[in-house]
Every structure is written in C-alpha cells, then in structure tokens.
C-alpha cells in the first residue's frame, strides 16, 4: 500500500460506489495491504457480484458480511476479522456505508430521520466500537510514535452536505435526513479524535467529492476511481495535525 504502509484495511459499504472503488484502488497499489476486508450488508446478492469477482482474483481480499444497522452483525464481523488477523491489529477502518434520501424539509418524517441517523451515525459509532480493540492493538504493535493511517486510524466518509456553514448551497437544499446525520457524524468524529488520541488512533472526516454513483447521480464531477485514488493519497499524508480534521478528497480543509 504505497504511502499508507498499513498491514490491514477494512472498508464498510464496499459492494458498490466509493466503497468498491476504495477496495479496487487498495488492491491495485504497488505494495497492497496484506489484508483488505470488504464489508457488505448482503454479500450474496447480485449487486455484490463485482466484489465477489475481486475476491476470486485477489487472495488478500476478504469479503465480510456487515450490516451497519445491526449490532449483532457488527460483532460477528469483528470476530471474523479478528480470526483472519491471527493476533495482529487492524490498521485502518474506513466507515463508508451510508444511505441517502432526497426527502425535503416539508415532507420528511420521523422514520426518515431515524433511518438516516441509524445508518449514517449510529452505524459508524457501533462499527468503531466493535473494532476498537483491534485498532488499539495495531497502535500498540506499531513502532511509530505519531498518529497515521499506517499505525491506526478511523476514517469516516462524510459530505459537504453535512457542513453547517454550507447549508444554504442550492444543490443541497433537500435530503434533510442525510444532511443532518452527516453533521452529526462530523461531531461524532470530533469526539472520537479526542477520546482515542491517547490510544494512538487517528480519527478524521473526509468529503469524497460529488462522485458519479447511485447515490451521487451521474452528474457528479468525479468518477469513482478518481475519488478513490485521491482519498487514498490524502490518507497517506495524515499525521497528528490532522486528528479531528474535516478534509475533502484533495486534502483541503472543509468548513464545519
């Protein structure tokens, strides 16, 4: 894994979109991770076929069933990953799984909001908690003293739509559950950056850009491959000063 240097990486929501793009990019690096754990809520369905094809091609890629809305599924996934790591820690956790709903302010209801928060905020919280022992182990094993993705890190994929300062932008005038839940994810990440700093775990947020995906639509400015490549480039350069940061795919600071 050129630049990152970690032994193991886990990506949630990896069966399509940005998650699948990150997995592809990790596997194509000149020095790829020893283990790439690609999580999917339903690994056996048709939309996960591309990921299954990669698993058959790359022996270092492990497909893990993980439903970010189920605490039982999350715990089972953590046990699966721990078994594969055979006593070693997990270097990098990328919380990418998320849902998007275009519902507007006048029509959003309780169920819309609950579903948005459950996947986009509570999911990353519970996933991070479940994999925390493995992240701590990786940080303890590392000879590095500072914070980095090659030592131990939690990266939460957020959005400019979660920026309170950018709330008036025309292109984000709807999707109330998504916007509110991503703003909450940003705060969660700040709390993680404070709470896990002494454990040697870097925590930060990254906005992947407007990407051509099922979620972002085909009007996006970036392809999945472009976004994934840029994101990994940013992650490879993170250090202590970036703990708690909110950056975009180019590494520029995002407004809160």
Question: Can you name each region flagged by the protein language model?
Answer:
Residues 54-72:
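Rossmann-fold cofactor-recognition segment
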Residues 12, 88-98, 120, 155-158, ...:
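Rossmann-fold scaffold of SDR-type NAD(P)-dependent oxidoreductases
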Residues 73-76, 123-130:
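Conserved mid-core alpha-helix of short-chain dehydrogenase/reductase
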Residues 68-88:
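Conserved Rossmann-fold cofactor-binding substructure of NAD(P)-dependent oxidoreductases
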Residues 20, 24, 122-125, 182-190, ...:
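Conserved active-site helix of classical SDR/Rossmann-fold NAD(P)-dependent CH-OH oxidoreductases
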